[in-house]
């Protein structure tokens, strides 16, 4: 009886880990497809794929950053800024944070908010001197 119970627990753990791996693969596949579309300048379809990646993993800083880049290319600057801001709160890698803050600076500069642009560029330099 005890052995049977242990087998059920192990089987359930296996299924849960398999589901997690499957979700990670789906997220990665959406990001890769989005990247291909972005590089081909098909920004609307790239946006769709990055949003699908975020549905799979709402805390993906990579998806947020890439979505921000895609939205920026479509002149959707406010939405892009929201994605960069969200990514900046999650991302831990200093180089990636530098890129996020640099892009925020570019958007602030384009919107003629020079004080915020300077602050964003300073944050970028703090993460990647």
Regions found by a protein language model. Give the residues of each.
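TPR alpha-solenoid repeat register
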Residues: 63, 97-100
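Short coil turns that delineate tetratricopeptide repeat
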Residues: 58, 92-95, 129
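Canonical positions in the second alpha-helix
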Residues: 53, 87-90, 124
């Amino acid at each position: 009886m005890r052995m049977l119970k242990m087998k059920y627990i192990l089987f359930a753990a296996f299924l849960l880990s398999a589901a997690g791996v499957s979700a990670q693969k789906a997220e990665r596949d959406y990001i890769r497809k989005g990247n291909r579309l972005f590089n081909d300048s098909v920004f609307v379809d790239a946006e769709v794929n990055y949003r699908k990646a975020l549905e799979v993993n709402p805390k993906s800083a990579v998806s947020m950053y890439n979505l921000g880049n895609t939205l920026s290319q479509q002149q959707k600057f406010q939405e892009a800024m929201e994605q960069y801001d969200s990514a900046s709160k999650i991302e831990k890698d200093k180089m990636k944070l530098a890129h996020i803050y640099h892009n925020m600076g570019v958007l602030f500069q384009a919107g003629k908010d020079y004080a915020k642009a300077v602050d964003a560029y300073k944050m970028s330099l703090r993460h990647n001197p």
